[in-house]
Amino acid sequence: MGACDFRCCTCLPLFVVMFGDSPNDLLNNLNEEHPLVVAVEYISKEESADVAAGSASAKHGVTGILAVQGAFAEHAAMLDRLGAPWKLLRAAEDFDDSIDRVILPGGESTTQGKLLRSTGLFEPIAAHIAAGKPVFGTCAGMILLARKLDNDSNIYFGALDAVVRRNAYGRQLGSFAATADFGSSSGDSAVLVEPGERVPGFADSASGAGSTTEISSDSIVLKDFPLVFIRGPFVAEVGSAATVETSLSGNVVGLRQGKILATAFHPELTDDTRIHELFLSL
C-alpha cells in the first residue's frame, strides 16, 4: 500500500479535521448523503442551526452537543441521520431541562476545558454526569471525562475511572484509520451487530415498536467498526469501575462506565452510525 496524503476518499475525514477544509473535487465524488459531505456543509455555513427537532418517529430526548470548539458539527450531522433531536451547547443558558444526554466532541481538550469554565457550561454538564445521565466523549471528550491524565496535571470532569494519555498517537500527520470490534461481551451472551445493521435497542425505540426480547446494551458488540484517530489519546490505566470496549494493538481506545461512553477515536467522521445508535439506546 502506497503512502497517503490523507486526501483520498478513505482518509478525507482526517484531512478535513487537520486542515479545516476539503478539496471540492474529492467531495464531489462522494454521495451527497455521505456524512462527511453533510458535515462540511454544516461547517461551511456562516450560521448553522443551533437546534434540530429530530424526526417525529424518534423516541429520544434532546442530545446536548458541546459546541465551544471541535468537531460538534459532525456529531450533529450524525444525529440528523438518525432522526434524533439535538441542541448545540455554547453557553450555560443553552443547557435546559430538555437535555437528557450530552456529547463531548473531539477537538483541543485544553481549549475546551477553559471554554467550559468561561461559558458557565462546566457546572451543568458536571451535574448531568453526576446524576448518572448518558454522556459520550470522543477523543478530547474522553480526556475531559478521565479521572486523571498521565501526562497533564489538568483534571476536568474526573468521572471516568481511567488514566488517559493525551496525544498518545503523536502528531496530526501521524493520524490513521483502523478497524476493530466495539463491545466487551463474548460467547453466547454477545449480540453481534454487523456493519449496516441497526443496534437493537435503538432500532426498537426509533420505530416506536417495543422490543419483544429485552437486550441489554452491555451485551452488544459492534463488529468491524471503523476507527479514525487524529492525534488521539489512549487509556494508560483502566480502573475497576470502567469496562474496556475496544483495544487496538494492545492499547485501550474505548471504554464504558454505566451510561458513560468514551472513545479515543472519531466515530462521527465515518459513515457508520452504530456507536451513536448505542449511545442513544442507553
Model-inferred region functions:
Residues 56-59, 94-96, 127-128, 136, ...:
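Solvent-exposed alpha-helices and their adjacent loops that cap or buttress functional pockets
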Residues 86-87, 135, 260:
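Hydrophobic anchor at the start of a short beta-strand
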Residues 108-190, 206-209:
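Cysteine-nucleophile active-site neighborhood
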Residues 39-43, 175, 189, 199-219, ...:
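C-terminal and late-domain segments of enzyme folds
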Residues 2-118, 123-128, 186, 193-213, ...:
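N-terminal beta1-alpha1 cap of cysteine-dependent amidohydrolase-like domains
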Residues 68, 138-140, 160, 231, ...:
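A secondary-structure boundary/capping signal
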Residues 103-104, 137, 263:
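Redox-cofactor binding/interface segments in oxidoreductases and associated redox assembly factors
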